[in-house]
């Protein structure tokens, strides 16, 4: 007897943990000026992969929970709420393009690679645009920081997300191809 809900929840937890580990231990901090650092990491690859395999709800929650916990435990507590929202949107964007626009589940191998690449690039573009805006609004309206500081932080965030997007998309496509014939042939979640 197979319980798909338990399998789905287990995979979501695994992807959240992988995103957490990538942020916590595999990030590269780059000085960006103004006393700020940009964080470059491949954790988005696991959010993308979760959204492709598990669909919108679990994929979006995977990224939101995994990277929000990483922020909290790494000492970036005030970054956790914007991280939750922006990573949730990243997962939703990837799942929407892959499953609603292109119907990834019905695609053959060659077409699936194109769909995965397009969905991953679209999701990362959404993240590069929305995350700086969310962080700017949060810093100005919730934390009460001056506009100039919030603006510099948003620019820093946009650059970090754009640079992180490239290896994340590449890794997500390769990982999807690797698990396509194992996990995906055994379990259909979407």
Task: Give the ranges of each region predicted by the language model.
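Loop-helix junctions at membrane interfaces
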Residues: 1-190
């Amino acid at each position: 007897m197979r319980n798909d809900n338990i399998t789905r929840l287990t995979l979501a937890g695994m992807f959240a943990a992988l995103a957490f580990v990538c942020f916590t231990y595999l990030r590269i901090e780059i000085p960006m000026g103004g006393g700020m650092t940009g964080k470059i990491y491949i954790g988005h690859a696991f959010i993308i992969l979760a959204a492709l395999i598990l669909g919108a709800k679990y994929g979006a929650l995977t990224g939101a929970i995994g990277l929000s916990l990483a922020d909290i435990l790494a000492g970036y507590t005030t970054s956790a709420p914007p991280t939750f929202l922006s990573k949730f949107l990243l997962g939703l964007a990837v799942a929407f393009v892959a499953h609603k626009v292109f119907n990834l589940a019905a695609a053959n191998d060659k077409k699936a690679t194109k769909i995965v690449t397009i969905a991953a690039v679209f999701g990362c573009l959404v993240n590069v645009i929305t995350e700086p805006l969310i962080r700017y609004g949060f810093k100005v309206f919730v934390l009460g920081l001056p506009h100039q500081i919030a603006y510099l932080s948003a620019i820093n965030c946009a650059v970090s997300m754009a640079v992180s997007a490239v290896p994340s998309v590449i890794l997500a496509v390769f990982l999807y191809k690797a698990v396509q014939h194992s996990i995906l042939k055994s379990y259909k979640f979407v």
